[in-house]
Every structure is written in structure tokens, then in C-alpha cells.
Amino acid sequence: MKNLVLLGGGYGNMRILLRLLPNNFPEDTVITLVDRTPFHSLKTEFYALAAGTSTDKQVRVDFPEHPRLKKVYGEISSIDREEKCVYLEDGTTIPYDDLVIGLGCEDDYHGVPGAEEHTLSIQTIAKSRVTFEKLCGLPPGSIVAIVGAGLSGIELASELRESRSDLQIKLFDRSPRILRAFPEKLSNYVKE
């Protein structure tokens, strides 16, 4: 049997699983999904978790079930492409015939001094929880600065306005307008 190993249970590898399972799964293949957590996280909804308008349960989706789908939970320590093996921090070795790496992204502070130490994040469920707790502890009238006026920044600002209308929310972006990846007409509408 061939072993297709999927590193990461994010959107890309979930799409692969949902396309293959249950009807397009080659008979000679098993799939091993490796992730830190036993569920898929709806990362595009973390802003609502941070703002307190959504719960952990609402941003989690169970991985699909299939007799030839094995789920392994842990941290990846290395990949040996010559030996075709993935190594986990707990010592587990996972051989593969084909490998898909879909491990997601991390916050990028663009070299801004102090940004990592003095900002909060919504990149993971755990970081979104911390952000929520900090926001809950702010007294009325506090200023919340959101760095990044793309979709996540705008969504977070909107949800915060709903859950904490007593806060002053300021958006900062390096672009002269919000939602720079979208048509200017939409950007202007959202700004108003």
C-alpha cells in the first residue's frame, strides 16, 4: 500500500481529504494526516473568537473518518526527503510515498521592533483565546489598535464593535486604504 502523508489539518489538506473521501480514494493507498490538534480549525473565524462573539466549539470541525485514514497528533521535528520519512518530536517516524506539506502560516512582524512582544494575535485558537481575555479585561474607553486592515483586521474590528461598543477601535495599515486587495469601491463602502 502507498502512504500519502498530509502534514497539517488546515484548509488545503482538508480539501484534499474531502475530494478523496469517500469515493475517489485509490484502493492501493492509505492516508496519514499529521496535525497538532484532533480537529480542523476554522482559522477564518478566529477574529470572532478573539472578539467574544464565537466559541471554541464553533471554530472546530472534526477530521473526516475513513478506514484507511490514520490520524497522528504531534509536532513535526524534521523531514528526511531521501529516506522519505517524517519525524515527530515524540520520536514517531512516519514513512511516506507522497507528501503534502500544508502547515499554515505564522505572524509576520516585518522587522518592526517590539511588535512581537507588544501585540496580540489571532493566528491560532490558543492565541485568539489570549486576545479575547486581554480584550475582556480592558476598561471602557480603552483604545484598541488593530494592525492590518485586510479581511481579518476589518472582521475583528467589526466583531469588537459588536461585542465591546465601549472601546475605541483604530485600524492601521501600510496601504493608503483598507481592504487593498479588493476593488476600491468595496474598500470605500466598508470605510464609510
Regions found by a protein language model. Give the residues of each.
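Glutamate identity and glutamate-enriched acidic tracts
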Residues: 27, 45, 65, 75, ...
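Short, mixed-charge, low-aromatic patches
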Residues: 12-22, 83-93, 146-153
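Beta1-alpha1 glycine-rich phosphate/pyrophosphate-binding loop at the start
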Residues: 1-70, 155-184
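FAD-binding core/adjacent interface of flavoenzyme oxidoreductases
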Residues: 1, 68-144
